[in-house]
UniProtKB/Swiss-Prot annotation:
Subcellular location as annotated: Cytoplasm
Keyword tags: Cytoplasm, Lipid biosynthesis, Lipid metabolism, Phospholipid biosynthesis, Phospholipid metabolism, Transferase
Gene field: plsX
Family designation: Belongs to the PlsX family.
Top-tier EC class: transferase
Name of the featured protein: Phosphate acyltransferase
Length: 345
């Protein structure tokens, strides 16, 4: 394999993680390198996996082979592994070695479509957390009628204290500034209603804490799931249980609508002609709601860039996760989040 230039971003890929690994992982890398899913600047990869499974796939993608180094490992994290088991027994896995090399500074970011709980546990164990952060969260950007917003947590912390939700809000503000380019992000707390008496005890307590911190953040108040896509807020804070359900329901509805639309287009010659006439506008609208293009959630609060791809991602979706990792690493998202957290106290 060719020598890698020093001015490029190095991304570690867990080739054993995901429903269709390693094929989707290598395909995603190829889409990035070929410019189908463009990234900022030059990119090269460190690919971690079992050689008997990865090398035959890698041989089919000469562009990836020429712009990567392969690291042979003897183990892989299973989708059924509990986080504690992965910490004790998966230290020879592709996921562990990828995160460990990030800790050593050998790569700039890690992308994995593997077991979420194991990825969070291994990353937290090896990288540690940003100062003053107790519980890292998983954050992802989503589209709205006005622009886009970030939602966290989407699955790392099923149950959260009020203090944890406040920390999520602070990290969300930092993420929105660094990734979305917002100057004064508005924060909404996901709830079942807008009245102060609604919600769990932790959510009500978090509401009080965020309102008290209004001098440090623009707190919108409670926001219901039906309102988040109107673009009224830049950051949606939720516990991992609620956030994950909101995310996956949204993705399912988006996929349903896209499927229904395609069915209508194929239903008649008139519909096909109309679709052809409106093709540019239709494509643009479809891209705005395509879950694949928003694949790639960042584990925020860690001392390193770790991006989680959907386990069911296809090549294009995985490439978008790589794009998120490249952008986050190139623009020093971790140091920017740490700086924002320090300023907000």
């Amino acid at each position: 394999m060719t020598e890698i230039r020093d001015d490029s971003i190095s991304i570690a890929l867990d080739a054993m993680g995901g429903d269709s690994a390693p094929d989707v992982v290598i395909e995603g890398a190829n889409l990035v390198l070929s410019g189908v899913v463009p990234c900022d600047g030059k990119v090269h990869f460190s690919i971690y996996g079992k050689k008997e499974e990865v090398l035959p796939v890698l041989a089919k993608y000469k562009l990836v082979e020429a712009n990567s180094v392969f690291v042979d490992v003897s183990d892989a994290v299973s989708s059924s592994d509990r986080p504690s088991y992965a910490l004790r027994h998966r230290r020879r896995s592709s996921m562990w070695h990828a995160v460990e090399d990030l800790k050593k500074g050998l790569v700039s970011a890690v992308v994995s479509a593997g077991n979420t709980g194991a990825l969070m546990a291994i990353s937290r164990h090896l990288l540690g957390t940003i100062h003053s952060i107790d519980r890292p969260a998983i954050a992802v950007a989503m589209p709205s009628q006005k622009s886009s917003f970030v939602v966290l947590d989407i699955g790392a912390n099923i149950e959260c204290s009020a203090d944890a939700l406040l920390q999520f809000a602070i990290m969300g503000v930092a993420f929105a500034k660094a990734i979305l380019g917002r100057t004064d992000p508005k924060v909404g707390l996901l709830n079942v209603g807008s009245e102060e008496v609604k919600g769990t005890y932790a959510v009500q307590e978090a509401f009080s804490l965020m309102r008290a911190a209004k001098s440090k953040m623009d707190f919108y108040g409670y926001i219901e799931a039906e309102e988040v896509f109107k673009g009224e807020v830049d950051v949606v804070v939720a516990d991992g249980f609620s956030g994950n359900i909101m995310l996956k329901t949204t993705e399912a509805v988006a996929n349903l609508l896209m499927s229904l639309f395609k069915g209508v287009v194929k239903s008649s010659i008139t519909a096909k002609i109309a679709a052809c006439m409106l093709k540019p506008s239709v494509r643009k609208t479809m891209e705005l709601v395509d879950p694949k293009l928003y694949n790639g959630a960042m584990l925020v609060g860690l001392n390193g860039v770790v991006v989680k791809s959907h386990g069911s991602a296809d090549g294009k979706a995985y490439a978008c996760a790589i794009k998120t990792a490249v952008h986050s690493a190139r623009y020093a998202i971790v140091s920017k989040i740490a700086s924002e957290i320090s300023e907000m106290g």
